Amino acid sequence: MDIRVDRKAFAGHTVLHDINLSLQTGEIVSLLGPSGCGKSTLLRIVAGLEQDFRGSVERIQGQVAFVFQEPRLMPWLTVEQNIGFSDDNGYDRKWVSQLIEEVGLSGFANALPKALSGGMAQRVAIARGLYSHPTILLLDEPFSAVDAFTRMKLQDLLLQLAERHAITLLLVTHDVDEALYLSDRVLVMGSRPGTITHELPVGLQTPRDRRDPLLARLKAEALTELHQAQVI
């Protein structure tokens, strides 16, 4: 997928400017930057949810799916029904059952959202994102609302699912450690207007050890770039 955003404005105010981004098949890329720099807007452009901009998006064949910061589950539907909700022709129960097992929610197919923890609800949201067999999965701060331990487990789950289904991930995050742990590349964004100021290749094999000193060095580099981009 190739994305070019020459300019995106709201009420005459430029929020994104001069962005060129290519996503390779099976690649995991994180967008890292401050609130208000346009990360989520860029994600919406990639998803096709925002079309009022100057530029272009050239998609590869296949579906693009979106996982939001909040699970956004229908409270009156079961886990199974929430995962297959987008299918107007009646959902594929066998596929839904497989996804429920893959995200670690076996035994909860008939549970309502009120019976789920925050981490469990986000597992449902990820399964719902995978239901359409996407080639690209877009995630907007998907783990920001859960505790640190749950976040680490969900990060590992996401990596397993991405490898199993051979999908490309584009992730928005404020968490430097998360970006480096998950990604093949980290793109630092500055603001006013939002643009990509630095690309940081991670270049480490997966699965990664969170204690790897190379990750610490990359974190120092990322923090330097964020500082130079006037993010911190």
Swiss-Prot record:
One of its GO terms (molecular function) is ATP binding. The lineage of its organism: Bacteria, Pseudomonadati, Pseudomonadota, Gammaproteobacteria, Pseudomonadales. Transmembrane segments: none annotated. It is a peripheral membrane protein. This is Aliphatic sulfonates import ATP-binding protein SsuB 2. Its main location: membrane. Gene3D superfamilies: P-loop containing nucleotide triphosphate hydrolases. GO terms for cellular component: plasma membrane. SMART domains: AAA (SM00382). It holds the Pfam family ABC_tran. It catalyses: ATP + H2O + aliphatic sulfonate-[sulfonate-binding protein]Side 1 = ADP + phosphate + aliphatic sulfonateSide 2 + [sulfonate-binding protein]Side 1. It comes from Pseudomonas syringae pv. tomato (strain ATCC BAA-871 / DC3000).
